[in-house]
Amino acid sequence: MREVEATLPSFCRQFFRGVQEYTSSRTRLAYAYDLRVFFEFLHSQNSVCSGMKITEFPLSVLDRITREDIEEYLDYITYYVKDGKEYSNNERGKKRKLSALKSFYNYYFRSELIKTNPAALVPIPKQHEKQIIRLDVDEVAILLDQVEEGEKLTKSQLKYHNKTKLRDVALLTLLLGTGIRVS
């Protein structure tokens, strides 16, 4: 955490101390990585911050960031190249990075250290549901037949299969018949 924190503006330490009581260390680390990407974006893409080192950004820079800047950031993180390596974020990644930014801005806004909170004006991107992939009736029958018969198994595998065949068929029948998810 300290290594990542050292690459951020000094005022970020106050944020991490402030949220320490109600966030896990993993959450704070994820925030740090996400904020680093945001500040790198500001440094390379935003004229307000381009002349300064990231570690030298003053807190007042947060008041000069607009809603449009944050929307440009979300567009930027869809696909970007850093140090010759390509990075991309799907809807879920963008949502997480925006949530980190909202928490960051909310902390300073509630502490009355900044006057504006442009992150609050940016709607969280909608996350589309993943399509459920289902087996058709023939595929279910083939799967159950394979479990019952245990074809193409070695002697030791066949010995183990004979002991667990009824259990395996029962479990698969339960999962396939009720739609219980294994996750």
Language-model regions: role of each:
Residues 1-183:
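Conserved catalytic core of the tyrosine transesterase superfamily
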